[in-house]
Amino acid sequence: MPKERIVAPSKEFAKLANVSLKEYKSKYKESIEKPEKFWAEQAKRLTWFKKWTKVLRHDFAKAKVEWFVGGKLNVSYNCLDRHLDSPLKNKAALIWEGDNPDESKVLTYHDLHREVNHFANVLKKFKVKKGDRVLIYLPMVPELAIATLACTRIGAVHSVVFGGFSPEALLGRIEDCKPTLVITADGGYRGGKPIELKKNVDAALAETKFKVNDVIVVKRTGDEGNLNWKEGRDHWYHYLMKDPEVKKECPAVPMESEDPLFILYTSGSTGKPKGVLHTTAGYLLGANLTFATIFDYKDTDTYWCTADIGWITGHSYILYGPLSNGATSLMFEGVPSYPDMGRFWDVIDKYKVTVFYTAPTAIRALMREGLEHIKKRSLASLRLLGSVGEPINPEAWEWYYANIGKSKCPIVDTWWQTETGSIMISGIPGAIPQKPGSASWPFYGIQPVLVDNEGVELKGKGEISGNLCIAKPWPSMMRGVYGDPKRFFDTYFSQFKGYYFTGDGANRDKEGYFRITGRVDDVLNVSGHRIGSAEVESALVEHKSVAEAAVVGFPHDIKGQGIYAYVTVKQGVVTNDLLKKELIAMVEKVIGKIARPDVIHWAPGLPKTRSGKIMRRILRKIANNEFDTLGDISTLADPSVVQSLIDDKKKYHS
């Protein structure tokens, strides 16, 4: 494969595209030079109850940002009500495809509006009011979308927790955000197997110091025999929705632009997950504009983002981006491998999906299966592909382009974060020529800069690598870490003064294309999901046999990054496969299966400085078989540990 292949948009695609290269350059220039004028114009895309008095007020050095000051609007109104006086009323808003291929459901905008209004009044019955937190721990079922939108309708702050997280992970989130109530399901399905949800909620609530008085339970599996039902606390969703005393109509509450919208927890470089706080107007505008522009949205599209709503990708590009544009968004409960490895392609053909947005991890897993399943399907409806969650390697990009897009669909390789709220760097289909493996150019209003380790901006027109920062505020950026302003400032604004620090490294070539090179902190990107090394280490040392643990990432064929755990056991403990299984089970219990280590390397000791700091740089190199580039290890407290780890790596983990 040529080192730097450039794929220009086809004339056919470019002719119908929403944005041309000339228009992109003009709009981008205005968005950087006259940001307030640009964003005031874009804000007309939303419906406001009251117009703002000031577009932007900020002190970036102090992490203070406010957009559309004085304005009032409602997210639910923008996603539902404003579409009802048009033909969109009877258009499919959500297409739900169950884990079982025989289960599906379509909700029009009228249907979704009705259900959201009704459930918003159920929430009000439980005294949920503006500013209260509601924790949602549901599978990918329509009730998840209904619950989030109902929260936004009455001004409650939702916090969706991915259904794969353990009771202990759930407990930490409950104690941090202190929800008025919890919404869960009796269970769920994943790959044909039932998964426990209410049981996990019960376990978390049994341990919490914060009392949750009410739990609303969606009936999904119907396995009532195994439910630990708590009268007075637990309430069936379907009974509540049939309650004749609950009104059907619920007015959308006018919200200030900067009112909190949702909290979404993400891993940090320290053990405790961060509650990323997003606010109303800026977030919605970011999701709305990026969806319409980057996915070249047409009103005839059937759009499918394969993410879970438990992650930011699902928030922005299953719910808020598509629905605020009046799009048809597909919501998928299942996995790409069930009932066989052709499931994604079946769903695309079944619903004539036109825009498909998935993760490199899924692409690599499907790539490994060969072309057998693809040849049995048409995929002719597709016109645009997307990639999200981690950098896509050029080999996977080429496979995706040739075999799924049939060499005619552009690929938007999108870089962004939970914290950024919406896509930051991406190709614009039909406008920007693509380079496999590159996230391309910045979106409107985004001013990325590369800085060295001292915070000095790296300028020049040649190829440059450095720490990726953002120089100016943008509407959809997070406004804080919930309940912890110091952590917000320390994490994102203290390391490089005057910049938002992404935690990623990047390379910029002479044409201005960005390639994301990965995390530069102690956060792992596993299958597109962020996992803090400290979280996994803390889980491992909970085991009575473990004295110490250090976790690093290593290249993984499918996941992008795998989890490599160095474990030192206590004196007298015998290391064996049974203990490895116990440690993996411990991590699954504390965090969830998503964080299970791929490799457990028994370590006689860990390389430390004389002050006791673990040298993770050395551990990463050993995990990556880079034994010849360790650098000077003579200053370590015990340099002999390094050779011992290398010998074991060659012997047991090669």
From Swiss-Prot:
Highest taxon of the lineage: Bacteria
GO CC, one annotated term: cytosol
InterPro entries (alphabetical): Ac_CoA_lig (IPR011904), ACAS_N (IPR032387), AMP-bd_C (IPR025110), AMP-bd_C_sf (IPR045851), AMP-binding_CS (IPR020845), AMP-dep_synth/lig_dom (IPR000873), ANL_N_sf (IPR042099)
Keywords carried by this UniProt record: Acetylation, ATP-binding, Ligase, Magnesium, Metal-binding, Nucleotide-binding
Source species of the chain: Leptospira biflexa serovar Patoc (strain Patoc 1 / ATCC 23582 / Paris)
Chain positions recorded as CoA binding sites: R190, G191, G192, K193, T313, S527
Membership in a protein family: Belongs to the ATP-dependent AMP-binding enzyme family.
Identification of the protein by name: Acetyl-coenzyme A synthetase
EC class: ligase
Xref: HAMAP family: Ac_CoA_synth (MF_01123)
Keyword Acetylation attached: yes
Binding-site positions, Mg(2+): V541, H543, V546
GO BP: any one term: acetyl-CoA biosynthetic process from acetate
Annotated EC: 6.2.1.1
Binding site for ATP: G389, E390, P391, D413, T414, W415, W416, Q417, T418, D504, R519, R530
PTM field: Acetylated. Deacetylation by the SIR2-homolog deacetylase activates the enzyme.
Cofactor(s) named in the record: Mg(2+)
Residue list for modification N6-acetyllysine: K613
Gene: acsA
GO MF terms, alphabetically ordered: acetate-CoA ligase activity; AMP binding; ATP binding; metal ion binding
Swiss-Prot/TrEMBL catalytic activity: acetate + ATP + CoA = acetyl-CoA + AMP + diphosphate
Protein's job: Catalyzes the conversion of acetate into acetyl-CoA (AcCoA), an essential intermediate at the junction of anabolic and catabolic pathways. AcsA undergoes a two-step reaction. In the first half reaction, AcsA combines acetate with ATP to form acetyl-adenylate (AcAMP) intermediate. In the second half reaction, it can then transfer the acetyl group from AcAMP to the sulfhydryl group of CoA, forming the product AcCoA.
